[in-house]
Amino acid sequence: MRKVLVIDTSVLCVWLKVPGKETCGPSNALVTYEKVSEKIEEEKKKGTTFILPLATIIETENHIAHSSGDRMSLGEEFAQIMIDSADEKSPWAAFTEQSSLWNPENLKKLAEKWKITVIGGQALGDASIVEVVKYYTDLGYEVEIFTGDEGLKAYEPTVEIPRRRRK
């Protein structure tokens, strides 16, 4: 089964070293630049396809635009990731694969779902990432959400482990 890695804002900001966003996740499982880089390289070697959701693009650019760091360098590095995704340059999936999620019918469905999940504190960005995860799961991919957000990680589909037959 082919695997996709859906990259969330929290992890992307750590990977880009956005000032103030150098780590993410709970204190007992802190996600650092070293852990992110190691995971990215490991998944590249496995042939995993990386997914850049629209919410991740919008949220990450906002953190970069409001950072106290070198916005020019951060912007250039992030722009290259966006271009690689748009061009489907390995390991990135083509951004256009997600375009059906943003048609009028699916946007209305997202709005209906979100107005219920917002009561529990789910942001619209996370709700849209959940839809990206569902999209790739329905296509038969093994999907991992690479995030420091335990709430979002909870939406990751479980992978069935084959059981040994008894003799």
Annotate each language-model stretch with its function.
Residues 23-24, 34-35, 39-45, 87-90, ...:
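Alpha-helix termini
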Residues 11, 56, 129, 151-152:
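Alpha-helix capping/helix-boundary segments
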Residues 1-52, 63-75:
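Short, well-structured N-terminal submotif of metal-dependent ribonuclease cores
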